[in-house]
Amino acid sequence: MLGCLFLLAALPVQAQSTDSPAATFSANASLTSQYISRGFRQTWGKPALQAGADYAHPSGWSLGTWASTVSDRYIQDATVEWDLYGGYSGTVAELGYSVLAYYYKYPGAVYRATGVKYDYGELSLGLSYKMLYAKYNHTVTPDFFGITHARGTGYLDVGANVDLGNAWTLNLHAGNGRVAGTGNAIWNWRDAKVGVTRAFDGGWSASAAVTRAWGATDAYDHYTLGIPNAAGQFDTSNPAAATLVVAISKTF
């Protein structure tokens, strides 16, 4: 997976004529009330700092990285999620498409009960048409987010970003996750989000959303890593519960 990203980075950059579009580099930063990924609260209900950077070549190839703070109550021994991604995207008439590789890294994080790291890699196929989009992510590494022998796990993400006018956008999302591997189906889930984003001058934006996930079983209802805290109690939570998330972001 990382090899794919390094190959993309090694692509030759050809001189552009004055009429050719130039490659673009952008960066972003956010402060959010909590980090929600695929319906789950990654920061145990606490705020998160997030930042990323993207490079896009006019040929359609791109590379990027993104990071967020996370909670070690949800991801054992983790404080940061660090993503690397790259691939190709383009359009045919009004239909957009993308083929991307992702690698999600959680430095120092290991689920101690099994010795499995939380790091994993995915291939992603995406389509978009006007305000609609659909994306399917397929796990290509042996393990998925601390779950062993889960190669082939899939996540379907569909939604719409509806222009409401006056710089407002309605954000709609539904997701469906299926965890591969013997006995791993207890971690299957669905999730949904309804939110709005308001764009401002200077690359600023503000957003608010309500999210919720539903487990196929009660495995998420009293989630714990099984390690006593200083008081000798187990930290438990339902990371899939409905929650409101607000954020302010800046694009550079």
Predicted feature residues:
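Residues that define the transmembrane beta-barrel architecture of outer-membrane proteins
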Residues: A23, G45-L49, A78-W82, L95, ...
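Repeated loop/turn-to-beta-strand initiation elements of outer-membrane beta-barrel proteins
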Residues: F25, S59-T65, A93-V99, M131-Y136, ...
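Structural signature of outer-membrane beta-barrel channels/translocons
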Residues: T18, D54-P58, S89-A93, G126-L132, ...
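Cleavable N-terminal export/targeting peptides
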Residues: M1-T24, F252
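Detector for outer-membrane/organellar transmembrane beta-barrel domains
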Residues: Y118-D191, V210-T211, T251
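Transmembrane beta-strands of outer-membrane beta-barrel pores
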Residues: L31-S37, A67-S71, G90, Y103-P107, ...
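Short glycine/proline- and aromatic-enriched beta-strand/turn motifs that initiate or cap beta-hairpins
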Residues: Q16-S71, T243-V245, S249
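Outer-membrane beta-barrel "beta-signal"
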Residues: V194-W204, D235-F252
